Amino acid sequence: MPTLTSYFGFLLVALTITLVLFISLSKIRLI
């Protein structure tokens, strides 16, 4: 199932990027 693995990997990367952006915005708001 290469397609399922690729989809899961893409979802994981998207979630990581979203989490990093959210943390960055939170830090900017704190400052």
Curated annotation (Swiss-Prot):
It comes from the Eukaryota. Keywords: Chloroplast, Electron transport, Membrane, Photosynthesis, Plastid, Thylakoid, Transmembrane, Transmembrane helix, Transport. One of its GO terms (biological process) is photosynthesis. The chain crosses the membrane at residues 3-23. It is a single-pass membrane protein. Its main location: plastid. GO terms for molecular function: electron transporter, transferring electrons within cytochrome b6/f complex of photosystem II activity. GO terms for cellular component: chloroplast thylakoid membrane; cytochrome b6f complex. It is found in: Plastid, Chloroplast thylakoid membrane. InterPro entries: Cyt_b6/f_cplx_su6. The keyword 4Fe-4S does not apply. The 4 large subunits of the cytochrome b6-f complex are cytochrome b6, subunit IV (17 kDa polypeptide, PetD), cytochrome f and the Rieske protein, while the 4 small subunits are PetG, PetL, PetM and PetN. The complex functions as a dimer. Component of the cytochrome b6-f complex, which mediates electron transfer between photosystem II (PSII) and photosystem I (PSI), cyclic electron flow around PSI, and state transitions. PetL is important for photoautotrophic growth as well as for electron transfer efficiency and stability of the cytochrome b6-f complex. Belongs to the PetL family. This is Cytochrome b6-f complex subunit 6. It comes from Populus trichocarpa (Western balsam poplar). The lineage of its organism: Eukaryota, Viridiplantae, Streptophyta, Embryophyta, Tracheophyta. The gene is petL.
